[in-house]
């Protein structure tokens, strides 16, 4: 299973990263990571767009869900049944917004291996015939940071931008909205950015750079879809 995952995901992404490193002027692995991130986000754009629209729809109907919960507050079984009937009547899948996360998880796992190999230069035997081996890899991002090592600035940026993204989504909630989902969302808005920052602080800065760029892309996409809606 590990070999299959390597062949279908890790190896192609590694080759794409090295190809970008070879063709982008300056041979800066940071620029190659940014370019790879943008390509991945464009590839996943349709699924993220669908997810954001689903989240927006769920937030728009939050007052009606709160009303159902208040109506059946003393009968949890009736409350659950009424909510499910409401979802079915309005053709809503409450789990559809989780799809991009499920898609992104294996990509993140693969990218972890890609960046470890790429940043260390341990790429021999994994390159396709049409991708030249650059030899040594320049891991200094514009000469300012070594992406092969953890970097606290990138870790803080990764957590900070994720907080901004979460805050943008929460700001659409109705003032005073209650309910378990709303309470959990508020808790996750603070917990996940902190967790992201801690993880990023322990990993090579190249992975944190990926997370910064992909989150910035998501913020722009989220702003566009919410304003358009």
Model-based region annotation:
Residues 1-229:
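Helix-loop-helix
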